[in-house]
A protein has these predicted regions:
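Active-site metal-binding core of divalent-cation-utilizing nuclease and nuclease-like domains
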Residues: 2-35
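Conserved catalytic cores of phosphodiester-cleaving nucleases, focusing on short active-site segments
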Residues: 29-31, 35-46, 60
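A conserved structural/catalytic subdomain of Rossmann-like adenosyl-cofactor enzymes
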Residues: 32, 46, 105-117, 355, ...
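Nucleic-acid nuclease catalytic cores
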Residues: 48-97
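Long recognition/docking surfaces used for binding and targeting
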Residues: 162-260
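Conserved S-adenosyl-L-methionine
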Residues: 266-384, 388-389, 396, 401, ...
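A short glycine-rich beta-alpha junction/loop motif
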Residues: 453, 658-666, 696-718
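A short beta-sheet element
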Residues: 627-685
Length: 740
């Protein structure tokens, strides 16, 4: 319930407004603005009593108005119960008559917010501008709907169909709560909505209706729960929002798949809507452009492009061009139907979206050399269809000079397997820019690490060209309590501004998140990854100190988890090149200061238990994931380990390091004499650059040796006794663990 201004219950109404003229009667709730009553709300605990609720609310308003001390123009009736959902009716007193409060041509179906109330009173014509639900509201509603479908025992793969079908039915009209055939009514309303479209062919209408019909065999158990789902969607003012510029279906469906119980098991991942808009804004679209997304999902990219085109359109001729402008493919029938609906809900979409694979020979040839813009977020790790094939197919669809923007798994741009492809790509096309995206962009639905690729089709990379490299680590959302919620510090506006400046030939100042590199350094299949090229921010003593504390804390956590590990502490763990010291305040590759080796052990399960630390790529306990017996193992001779994901740890004990598989540990052997404090300094230098390494771009030796480190500005001869500190910690821990 939106409380807007002052929110008063029955007794509070009596205390604050004793002169309303109501006698002993009082409404359930009154809402005030600036101390003046503006809304009356009356509630009933049965769904069928919704007319009573709104009639009583209007009657209270009229009595108060006749008293002439206050004028209340908004009445709200609420009826229902948790198990069946709620109906909300909002009326406005216009010229002495009560009318539905309207937004975008549809009745408002939720308790209005303060902003919506102010808008209604300002217009004074029984209309308002509904506030688009926030990300949090979409998430909460999606979780509720998903839980209802789970309770109704609707199969996971069939749940998205319910969302699409009910949304389409509500788009067509209001659903009668007294009906005895709720599924039948919803199917009939969905069918009517699609059949009335002037932009779908008869064949596509039939296919859409087939894809969206809720059959009794699969959905018969849903009937007792359907009104709750309708209630939740109405709470979001679905009918009014569908008529606005907001991508209601896309935003709700994205939240539904991300946060609904079991829904991520469907393996469907869609690009967040603020990222599809960002991608559209990066390259821009114009009236007359043809736009394609060959793996369009629910149509996020197409909706963003379509909406951008509508803003540029000022005449009927432009509208006709827009109707023919967007094309897409998706293989999932339900997802395909939702993408068609998404364009349908935009009002002018012709929906040139096909339910087939874009990689099939016929489909691929049908779109070759026809488009000005291609957008893409291909399936991640799909067997037999690597991401590069979708990129190639997108580039084929473009005319010469057409622009491509793709959100793609970052491994394509970093790993050795795709080196030849990267080299070949720049022979055929122009790589314009790369922007790495936040690691948690798809949380909690997927853990894919992605980057945006921007390219110009069928124009070989000019030798003297520049390439824009950006690192987007804040997209305006953060992880909080299992959700991604809005936060401050959004980099997207700045990144967009700098990219446009780059495209227009302006000077780009090198920073910690943006750099322009010469194309010749990417020749021969070199990485496209921004993480390889963006410079590292220089650390001050405070930064180093904070990182050092984390390194020390990791050692303490390790001893807490494995107290017997102290038996492997080695007083000589750092005796290297006693007479030679490193150059001071020098920035150079890591290999200048350390030799880099790879661990040689087998998997942990290959060894029996003991007291020797086994170091892998875990994060919580210094990389130590177990203790193994000394017999027949090969101890490491370097005092720093670096995990596959770029985290460096001090290892002041005899230990062994994982050497098999993709998560192999790298071992650093100092080339110079170093004190413990100096080792901590270099560890901090490495850990400050963890952002460079991910599952898609691991800290392999060839990358690690080129990592830029800056040596200390002075020698730290006054050292710390790390062995003594850790031994003391173990003793104190044992004492505190005693129960007396």
């Amino acid at each position: 319930m939106s409380k807007g201004g002052d929110f008063l219950e029955e007794q509070e109404i009596t205390d604050c407004f004793p002169d309303l003229g109501l006698g002993l009667n009082r409404p359930d709730f009154m809402l005030c603005l600036h101390g003046e009553p503006v809304i009356i709300i009356e509630t009933k605990n049965e769904l069928c009593k919704y007319k009573n609720a709104i009639n009583e609310a209007m009657e209270y308003c009229e009595i108060i108005n006749r008293n002439k001390k206050h004028e209340i123009k908004i009445a709200i009736g609420v009826a229902g119960e948790p198990e069946n959902g709620y109906i909300v009716i909002v009326k406005y007193l216009k010229d002495g008559k009560w009318e539905d409060l309207i937004s975008h041509g549809n009745a408002v179906t939720a308790i209005i917010s303060k902003t919506e109330c102010i808008n209604a009173l300002a217009s004074d014509d029984a209309t308002t501008e509904v506030v688009i639900p926030s990300t949090r509201e979409f998430i909460d509603a999606a979780i509720e709907v998903s839980n209802i479908l789970r309770t109704a025992k609707i199969e996971t793969t069939l749940r998205p169909k319910v969302v699409g079908t009910v949304t389409t039915a509500l788009y067509y009209g209001d659903i009668d709560i007294t009906t005895k055939d709720i599924l039948g009514d919803i199917n009939r309303m969905m069918t009517s909505a699609i059949n009335e479209s002037q932009h779908f062919s008869d064949a596509k209408k039939a296919k859409l209706i087939e894809a969206l019909t809720l059959g009794l065999n699969d959905f018969g158990s849903l009937s007792p729960f359907i009104f709750r789902i309708i209630s939740i969607l109405k709470r979001l003012n679905i009918r009014a929002v569908l008529q606005s510029d907001a991508d209601f279906l896309g935003m709700f469906y994205e939240a539904f798949l991300r946060y609904g119980a079991d829904n991520n098991a469907m393996g469907i991942v869609f690009t967040p809507r603020h990222i599809t808009k960002f991608c559209t804004d990066l390259v821009g679209v114009e009236i007359g452009h043809k736009i394609i997304d060959i793996t369009c999902g629910t149509g996020g990219f197409l909706v963003s492009a379509f909406d951008a085109l509508k803003k540029e359109c000022h005449n009927d001729e432009g509208k006709d061009l827009i109707r023919e402008s967007v094309y897409g493919f998706d293989t999932n029938p339900t997802v395909w139907a939702l993408s068609c609906l998404n364009m349908f809900f935009r009002g002018d979409g012709k929906s040139n979206i096909e339910n087939t694979s874009s990689l099939e020979k016929g489909a691929r040839s049908s779109v070759r050399n026809k488009f000005n813009r291609a957008f893409l977020n291909p399936p991640f790790h799909q067997e037999g269809e690597p991401e590069r094939e979708f990129i190639d197919a997108s580039m084929e669809s473009l005319i010469q000079g057409g622009l491509f923007v793709g959100v793609v798994y970052a491994g394509v741009f970093a790993d050795e397997e795709n080196k030849v492809w990267r080299e070949d790509f720049m022979r055929k096309h122009t790589l314009i820019g790369m922007i790495s995206l936040p690691d948690e962009l798809f949380y909690p639905n997927a853990s894919a690490i992605t980057s945006i690729m921007i390219a110009r089709a069928k124009v070989p990379q000019p030798k003297n060209s520049n390439i824009f490299m950006g690192r987007l680590y804040n997209d305006g959302f953060e992880k909080l309590k299992g959700k991604r919620v809005e936060c401050s510090g959004n980099q997207i506006p700045h990144m967009l501004q700098e990219f446009h400046k780059f495209m227009n030939g302006g000077h780009i100042k090198e920073s910690n998140d943006i750099i322009v590199v010469r194309a010749n350094i990417l020749k021969d299949g070199a990485e496209y990854s921004p993480q390889q090229y963006i410079p590292q921010q220089k650390l001050d003593y405070k930064d180093v100190d904070n990182l050092n504390k984390k390194t020390l804390m990791s050692l303490f956590q390790t001893i807490t988890s494995y107290p017997e590990i102290t038996e492997s502490l080695d007083d000589g763990f750092m005796q290297y090149n006693k007479d030679k010291r490193f150059p001071l305040n020098k920035t150079d590759n890591l290999e200048t200061f350390f030799d880099v080796k790879t661990g040689k052990s087998k998997g942990l399960k290959s060894y029996s238990a003991g007291i020797v630390p086994y170091v892998s790529s875990g994060d919580d306990t210094n990389g130590v994931v177990g203790l193994v017996a000394e017999d027949g193992i090969e101890l490491c001779d370097g005092c720093i380990t670096v995990s596959a994901f770029g985290t460096a740890y001090l290892q002041p004990w005899n230990y062994m390091a994982r050497g098999n598989g993709g998560s192999s540990v790298r071992v650093l052997v100092p080339k110079y004499r170093m004190t413990v404090k100096e080792l901590f300094w270099f560890i901090a230098q490495i850990n400050s650059q963890r952002w460079r390494f991910t599952y898609a771009r691991q800290a392999i030796k060839s990358r690690l040796i080129k990592l830029k480190l800056t040596s200390p500005p002075e020698y730290f001869e006054k050292d710390i006794d790390i062995i003594g500190k850790l031994t003391d910690f173990k003793t104190k821990l044992a004492e505190l663990s005693e129960i007396e």
